[in-house]
Amino acid sequence: MKPTLLILALLGSFASAQDYLEIAANPGGAGKGRSIVLVAGDEEYRTEETMPMLAKILAKTHGFNCIVLFSTDEKAGYIDPNNQKNIRGTEVLDNADLMIIGTRFRQLPEAQLAPFARYLNAGKPVIGIR
């Protein structure tokens, strides 16, 4: 019976997974009320590892709400830096105050690209890292 409960608990955690990683802000920081979206998507520089670390520093030390988007496998949903055609959750850019992007050679579908275009056309700030 216990293994069955463990399996059900694990399946439930996968079913409720988000399309992105959200790190809550430290309420006392200078970035209070501001949101940063960090976009990770390259196979060479391992931004899927470094962006969450940067997001945690920005959230916990400086008080920004941070969301990290990842290049993911379209079917299974796991983080896949080699997948150049899928970054889920790009609609969160509509509420971002800053975008930090570390991607290379992405070919996203129009639905995922449109939030990038809206963000850039709004004249909001971008930091690109490599």
Predicted regions and their residues:
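Nucleotide donor/acceptor-binding cores
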Residues: 34
